[in-house]
């Protein structure tokens, strides 16, 4: 029941409460265990595992638990012919698990992408609209309850990585593999990146992407430049948005609140009704016996256009040296702007590259950093032009 209900005298008298969490996993009067504790270790893991072993259905909103132990727990659920449902674990009020696991199952999904963390989207929206620094916006988000007191999992991209890793497993019939997911958060983005992005016709979003091409998988979470006119640039504040590409319908777009008591509670109740109606699905889409171990590509092997921001001395010949370092790796420049830097006698050189392999870009950046005229700060952000209309 909602936490406010536990403080009600009538509720306390009419509902059996216990401080012995593990007893729920073995209690013969319990048919369905709902776990909303959180975390991948400790009591949450122990009680869910024990409940499944004792042939009890489990509903959870714990994406960290499933991203770390999803293969093991799914196998136990399958062996005991019980449900392990987790609609509330991904994108709050958006029924994305049901859509991917059931409704679009036969449509040959080839890509899932979007905004899966409301805290980051709220912060990036405020930075874009108000030209504020990251730390100031984070403090404001914490005061308003949009960010946790310890926001590490959110702002470092870990929460979004948990979610896209699970969706990838369901969509592409592969085991859950969080370690193979590339993760980069939003902490290095500052207000000037938004200023430059806007001038170039872009905004910045934390995107989660999972895709399958032939027998290769991509799983990644990182900030991206997206076109200002695109639909995804307009997804603001704590709202989540997910696109599922398939070979039958094409783009299936889902948008809604990513967290909160109402959306989370609605998803939990949806899972509960499925169990009561006798609806059973393999937790990760198919039997664990049918999961295929496909190669998950490293980010270094992928190719993107890039935004490069280089702080360098404002003197003749510097741009020629930077261009030479890029051309050695056959990296061509689409556009360039130069702005005064906060530092005296320095300039901010902003480049947009054509599509290039990330390993090549990183090699060029190393060479650029060694130039005596360049400060140690060379920033790059990947550009996603093709994902969203």
What is the predicted function of each stretch?
Residues 42-53, 63-92, 97-101:
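Rossmann-fold NAD(P)-binding glycine/threonine-rich loop
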Residues 18-19, 34-35, 58-61, 84-88, ...:
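General beta-strand structural signal in soluble alpha/beta enzymes
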Residues 267, 272-389:
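A conserved regulatory-domain signal marking ACT and ACT-like small-molecule sensing domains
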Residues 78-159, 166:
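Rossmann-like NAD(P)H-binding beta-loop-alpha module
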Residues 136-234, 239-241, 260:
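Substrate-binding/catalytic subdomain of NAD(P)-dependent oxidoreductase enzymes
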Residues 19-61:
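Rossmann-fold NAD(P) dinucleotide-binding segment
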Residues 1-6, 10:
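Single conserved hydrophobic/aromatic residue that forms the stacking wall/gate
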Residues 110-113, 121-124, 140, 145-150, ...:
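Catalytic, metal-anchored helix/loop core of enzyme active sites in primary metabolism
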């Amino acid at each position: 029941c909602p936490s406010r209900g536990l403080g009600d005298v009538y509720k306390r008298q009419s509902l059996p409460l216990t401080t012995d969490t593990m007893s729920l996993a073995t209690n013969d009067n319990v048919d369905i265990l709902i776990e909303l504790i959180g975390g991948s270790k400790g009591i949450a893991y122990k009680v869910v595992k024990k409940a499944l072993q004792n042939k009890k259905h489990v509903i959870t909103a714990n994406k960290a638990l499933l991203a770390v132990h999803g293969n093991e727990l799914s196998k136990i659920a399958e062996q005991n012919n019980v449900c392990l449902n987790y609609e509330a674990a991904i994108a709050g009020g958006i029924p994305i698990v049901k859509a991917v696991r059931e409704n679009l199952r036969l449509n040959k999904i080839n890509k899932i992408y979007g905004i899966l963390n409301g805290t980051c989207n709220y912060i990036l929206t405020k930075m874009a609209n108000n030209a504020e620094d990251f730390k100031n916006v984070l403090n404001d988000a914490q005061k308003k309850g949009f960010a946790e007191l310890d926001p590490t999992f959110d702002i470092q991209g870990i929460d979004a990585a948990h979610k896209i890793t699970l969706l990838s497993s369901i969509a592409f019939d592969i085991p859950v593999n969080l370690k193979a997911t590339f993760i980069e958060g939003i902490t290095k983005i500052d207000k000037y990146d938004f200023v430059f992005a806007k001038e170039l016709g872009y905004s910045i979003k934390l995107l989660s992407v999972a895709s399958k091409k032939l027998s290769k998988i991509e799983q990644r979470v990182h900030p991206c430049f997206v076109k200002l006119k695109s639909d995804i640039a307009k997804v603001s504040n704590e709202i989540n948005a997910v696109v599922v590409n398939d070979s039958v319908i094409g783009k299936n777009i889902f948008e809604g609140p990513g967290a909160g008591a109402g959306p989370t509670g609605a998803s939990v109740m949806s899972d509960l009704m499925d169990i009561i109606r006798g609806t059973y699905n393999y937790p990760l889409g198919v039997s664990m016996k049918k999961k295929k171990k496909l190669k998950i590509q490293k980010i270094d092997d992928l190719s993107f256009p890039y935004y490069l921001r280089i702080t360098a001395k404002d003197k003749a010949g510097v741009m020629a040296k930077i261009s030479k370092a890029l051309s050695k790796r056959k990296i061509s420049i689409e556009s360039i702007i130069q702005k005064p830097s906060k530092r005296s006698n320095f300039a901010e050189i902003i480049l947009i590259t054509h599509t290039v392999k990330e390993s090549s870009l990183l090699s060029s950046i190393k060479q650029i950093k060694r130039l005596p005229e360049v400060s140690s700060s060379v920033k790059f952000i990947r550009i996603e032009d093709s994902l969203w209309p």
